[in-house]
């Protein structure tokens, strides 16, 4: 689970430190120690975008049966209003959570988060250098494909340049098909003289599927079937897309040092009419407007 970092201002500040593989020096006992020079770091700041879904409830919606309500329940408009309020809060929270998950996946897969919406078109760039693209017959499924060799090389590359032990691989839909269909993978898995791993797919909660385990490199294999509705890339033709691109392979650690930062939420407090700043990951509000009478339910977040 990624713990949230709640910021008390609208700006989030990030310090980026690049590690290395230096070792402590040998010294003579009478000469004393040798300084291990500290690495530098870069500080970056960013104003997180506003995520602000809302819903509107009017009087006529409360006079008729809600979806799923018994035909003869006898619920009053006031009771329907209370139930609808809870359902609206849950809907807005789910939509915001999906947006946060999409942001996290974009950061992991591409190293960038495109912020595209009404009045905003920006990119958060984490400066990733650990992206590899296979081409031609070297692509998985090609005549020169070396799937197990690729996974071993990429694991070593992360260990050397990223200073982390990756122990999980997440395969996109097409990458998973190519992995299972690869003759070398099938041959190694069928070798009874060597334990190179086990393929034993099973479903896990929330769209996750465990595929199996490799012993060299030491990787647990997973697939993730979650999708999202993209209505901003091409508004004329919105489409449902997989969170994990079909041809992607993600190598990741099961113990990552990740952080989810949130900027502060500022709003006008209805009772006092004053501006208020709240240090929170979610700001849920409900207020009334007239002409016509309606209740506004909104969620504000700055992930």
What are these regions (language model features)?
Residues 136-149:
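A surface/extracellular/periplasmic glyco- and lipid-processing/surface-interacting theme
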Residues 149-208:
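Ordered core of a single globular domain
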Residues 131-133, 275-276:
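Short acidic (Asp/Glu) and glycine-rich catalytic loops that position anionic groups and cofactors
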Residues 17-53:
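N-terminal low-complexity, intrinsically disordered segments
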Residues 186-303:
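Sequence/fold signature of self-assembling virion shell proteins
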Residues 1-8, 13:
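Single conserved hydrophobic/aromatic residue that forms the stacking wall/gate
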Residues 49-131, 146, 150-175, 289-301:
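Long, contiguous amphipathic alpha-helices that act as assembly "spine/axial" helices in icosahedral shell
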Residues 3, 152-156, 281-283:
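Short alpha-helical segments and helix-capping/turn motifs at coil-helix boundaries
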């Amino acid at each position: 689970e990624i713990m949230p970092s709640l910021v008390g201002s609208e700006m989030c500040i990030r310090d980026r430190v690049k590690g290395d593989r230096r070792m402590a020096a040998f010294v003579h006992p009478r000469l004393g120690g040798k300084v291990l020079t500290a690495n530098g770091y870069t500080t970056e700041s960013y104003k997180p975008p506003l995520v602000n879904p809302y819903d509107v409830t009017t009087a006529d919606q409360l006079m008729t049966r809600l979806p799923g309500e018994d035909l003869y329940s006898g619920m009053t408009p006031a009771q329907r209003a209370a139930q609808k309020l809870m359902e609206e809060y849950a809907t807005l929270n789910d939509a915001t959570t999906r947006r946060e998950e999409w942001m996290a996946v974009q950061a992991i897969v591409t190293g960038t988060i495109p912020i595209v919406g009404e009045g905003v078109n920006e990119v958060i760039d984490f400066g990733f250098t650990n992206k590899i693209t296979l081409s031609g017959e070297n692509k998985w499924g090609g005549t020169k494909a070396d799937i197990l060799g690729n996974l071993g090389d990429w694991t070593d590359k992360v260990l050397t340049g990223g200073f982390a032990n990756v122990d999980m691989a997440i395969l996109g839909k097409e990458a998973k098909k190519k992995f299972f269909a690869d003759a070398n993978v099938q041959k190694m898995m069928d070798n009874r003289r060597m334990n190179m791993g086990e393929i034993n797919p099973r479903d896990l909660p929330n769209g996750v599927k465990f595929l199996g385990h490799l012993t060299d490199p030491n990787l647990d294999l997973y697939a993730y079937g979650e999708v999202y509705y993209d209505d901003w890339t091409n508004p004329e033709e919105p489409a449902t897309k997989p969170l994990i691109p079909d041809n992607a392979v993600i190598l990741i650690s099961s113990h990552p040092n990740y952080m989810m930062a949130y900027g502060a939420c500022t709003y006008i407090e209805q009772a006092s009419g004053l501006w208020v700043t709240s240090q929170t990951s979610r700001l849920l509000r409900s207020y009334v407007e007239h002409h016509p009478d309606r209740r506004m339910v909104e969620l504000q977040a700055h992930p």
